[in-house]
């Protein structure tokens, strides 16, 4: 079994734990590779085991950090590699274990005592050109703070809403605990097959969040005369011209998480309570 290790670059504790995991697996004769950015910030790994995320061809990646670390892995690996997420962030909605549980969890993995939780992603096309898939959300924002943008969005060809707002969040169930929740969107069980549409600070009180089936094709018309900003999972940003069409649909790819329990609650809701 081949492992990749990725760590949060700005926390020494995460880098030190990454090294301990690396050393444990090497001593037990497993093939292990380390993200080159972790090596730059903590150059104690063997240089021959250092790879960029894009070049990692492994059976599992151990991501030590917050949700941002997990999203960085997702956006920089070319294959759907299972991820064991170790929480060294603020809340760790995507994490399966805490740092103290790391080596027990690895022992269970080596014994085959785990399962894979697949999460849907969404794909966005700008004028039919695809950009990176999103595990959490795609966000369309006004490029000038304090200025609203005018959007129309259609679900399967039918007009769903015509809004003037700061923007629009298109989210997966996984992303319902992220930006969409802070913007007043619903908390959605990650096992549901759905896509969320959450207006950001709409002018009209009638513009409410909408949940549609994940088989839906969503088209957004940008009618404002100024540029907009489009973000994917907070990892990819681009400025786009006015008067264009954006299409969002379910991606054929999925994110795979290593899990040890099929129980969703109460851990899921406890993290929400901790957030607020």
Swiss-Prot record:
Q: Name one GO cellular component term.
A: cytoplasm
Which Pfam families does the UniProt record give?
A: NAD_kinase (PF01513), NAD_kinase_C (PF20143)
Cofactor field? a divalent metal cation
**What is this protein's name?**
NAD kinase
Family per record: Belongs to the NAD kinase family.
Q: Give any GO molecular function from the UniProt entry.
A: metal ion binding
Residues the record marks as active site: 67
EC numbers, comma separated: 2.7.1.23
Q: What class of enzyme is it?
A: transferase
Tell me where it mainly resides. cytoplasm
Ordered alphabetically, the record's keywords are: ATP-binding, Cytoplasm, Kinase, NAD, NADP, Nucleotide-binding, Transferase
Subcellular location(s): the record lists: Cytoplasm
Function, as annotated: Involved in the regulation of the intracellular balance of NAD and NADP, and is a key enzyme in the biosynthesis of NADP. Catalyzes specifically the phosphorylation on 2'-hydroxyl of the adenosine moiety of NAD to yield NADP.
- Return one Gene Ontology term, BP aspect: NAD metabolic process
Catalytic activity reads:
NAD(+) + ATP = ADP + NADP(+) + H(+)
Which positions bind NAD(+)?
A: 67-68, 72, 136-137, 147, 164, 166, 177-182, 201, 235
């Amino acid at each position: 079994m081949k492992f990749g290790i990725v760590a949060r670059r700005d926390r020494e504790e995460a880098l030190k734990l990454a090294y301990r995991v690396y050393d444990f697996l090497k001593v037990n004769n497993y093939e292990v590779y380390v993200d080159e950015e972790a090596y730059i910030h903590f150059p104690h790994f063997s240089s021959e085991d250092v790879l960029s995320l894009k070049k990692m061809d492994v059976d599992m990646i151990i991501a030590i950090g917050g949700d941002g670390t997990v999203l960085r892995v997702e956006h920089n690996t070319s294959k759907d590699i299972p991820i064991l997420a170790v929480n060294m962030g603020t809340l760790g909605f995507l994490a399966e274990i805490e740092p103290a549980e790391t080596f027990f969890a690895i022992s269970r993995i080596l014994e085959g005592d785990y399962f894979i939780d697949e999460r849907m992603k969404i794909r966005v096309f700008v004028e039919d050109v695809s950009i990176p898939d999103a595990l959490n959300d795609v966000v369309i924002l006004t490029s000038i703070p304090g200025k609203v943008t005018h959007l129309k969005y259609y679900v399967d060809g039918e007009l769903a809403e015509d809004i003037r707002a700061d923007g629009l969040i298109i989210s997966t169930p996984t992303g319902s605990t992220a930006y969409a929740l802070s913007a007043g969107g619903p908390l959605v069980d990650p096992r549901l097959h759905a896509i969320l549409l959450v207006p950001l600070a709409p002018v009209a009180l009638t513009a409410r969040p909408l949940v549609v089936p994940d088989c839906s094709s969503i088209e957004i018309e940008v009618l404002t005369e100024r540029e907009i900003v489009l973000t994917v999972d907070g990892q990819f940003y681009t400025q786009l011209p006015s008067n264009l069409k954006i299409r969002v649909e379910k991606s054929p790819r999925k994110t795979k998480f290593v899990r040890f329990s099929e129980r969703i609650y109460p851990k899921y809701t406890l993290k929400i309570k901790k957030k607020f």
